[in-house]
Amino acid sequence: MTERELLTAGLRELGVAECPSAADNLLRYSEILREKNKVMNLTAITDPTEIVTRHFLDCAALAPYMPQDGRVLDVGTGAGFPGMPLAILCPQTEFVLLDALRKRIDFLNEVIADLGLTNVTAVHARAEDYARDNRDTFDLAVSRAVADLRVLSELALPMIKVGGAFLAMKAEDCTEEVETAANARMILGAPDAEVLHYTVPFDEVSRA
């Protein structure tokens, strides 16, 4: 299968509606990522097929949970995961990609400009600093492979509106981490965490 065929089939398996330009934009994003990765440490995954499965389709698993016409914060976005693929797949949702490293934000701004995306903004800031002026601002927060869930909860939850949610992408066996974060959730007034398991199409690894 080509990367395009793999992407289209994987999105279909995940039940993600693909807007007309999504595949083109994701594959272009992959090109820019691989090119910039030659001079910047953006990702350890450089094979085009693995970028589709282990980055794009993994992130796309969250697409059904994105609030239409809502605001989503990606905490510690790195090279744009999961926020950038989600912004491409969910054009009616507004995304803010937050990272403390300026070179990553410069890269993301280049991707945004190249793809002509209008629903995503890359912000250079530490989460604890950004939170001071953005409490109760977002309908949803997401993160992927950033930090311990207890720390993430303390950073992200204050920026989420009442009734919103925080989706933290973790390894399949994250029970201990979820339990350790329980006190932070309680102090911040968040409900008990729910662990959802899923398998990425064309990838043998299960995630949570």
Q: At which residue positions do the language-model features occur?
A:
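Class I SAM-dependent transferase core
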Residues: 2-73, 103-106, 110-120
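Residue-level signal for inorganic ion chemistry
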Residues: 33, 86, 170
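Short loop/edge segments at beta-strand edges and connector loops
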Residues: 46, 123-126, 196-197
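Conserved SAM/SAH cofactor-binding pocket of Class I
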Residues: 57-146, 153-154
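Helix-to-beta-strand junctions that scaffold the AdoMet/dcAdoMet cofactor pocket
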Residues: 90, 160-162
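Short beta->alpha connector loops
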Residues: 146-149, 174
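Conserved beta-strand signature within the Rossmann-like core of class I S-adenosyl-L-methionine
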Residues: 163-173
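Active-site capping/gating segments
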Residues: 173-208
